[in-house]
């Protein structure tokens, strides 16, 4: 079941298992923000997102939130929530992010159970180009519990794909 709830930004917790850049499960929001700002993987691109968002927060794409006990974890929409937390000073940043849009302190969120959230995330990101082939396989195996693909096995055993990003393509996976 899904429902829309208005939640306070200060209560929202960033998802450590985000396929964009998974981090230690005990990491804090600040740890995730610091990593996103470093953006060594070039997957977060927060300044670009801030520019694309325009002058205000667009409510047409709601963050997907799953409650773990009383903790609302942001499963989808972490980049937008990071920008919101920066905008309101809920995390510390050592650099200026230009073009931060206006974001209210309370926002509507799609609150659902983990299974629905994961299905929605896979539908939204799995084949849209926002994830690499390796990201998708990692998500399917580590988050959704599917068997490890041969492509992911090859990466885990050799590191070949991450060392050669030109191999991180669907057609390469299909050939393997």
Residue spans for each PLM region:
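Short alpha-helix boundary/capping and kink motifs at helix termini
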Residues: 5, 17-71
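A general structural signal for short secondary-structure junctions and capping/turn motifs
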Residues: 1-4, 56, 99-102
């Amino acid at each position: 079941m899904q429902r829309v709830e208005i939640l306070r930004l200060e209560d929202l917790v960033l998802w450590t298992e985000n396929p964009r850049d998974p981090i230690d499960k005990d990491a804090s929001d600040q740890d995730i923000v610091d990593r996103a700002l470093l953006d060594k993987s070039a997957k977060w691109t927060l300044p670009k997102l801030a520019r694309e968002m325009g002058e205000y927060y667009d409510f047409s794409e709601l963050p997907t939130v799953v409650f773990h006990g009383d903790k609302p974890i942001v499963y989808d929409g972490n980049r937008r929530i990071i920008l919101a937390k920066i905008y309101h000073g809920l995390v510390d940043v050592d650099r200026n992010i230009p073009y931060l849009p206006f974001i209210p302190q309370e926002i509507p969120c799609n609150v659902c159970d983990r299974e629905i959230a994961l299905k929605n995330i896979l539908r939204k990101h799995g084949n849209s180009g926002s994830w690499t082939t390796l990201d998708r396989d990692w998500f399917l195996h580590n988050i959704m519990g599917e068997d490890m693909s041969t492509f992911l096995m090859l990466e885990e055993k050799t590191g070949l794909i991450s060392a050669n990003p030109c191999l991180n393509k669907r057609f390469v996976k299909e050939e393997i």
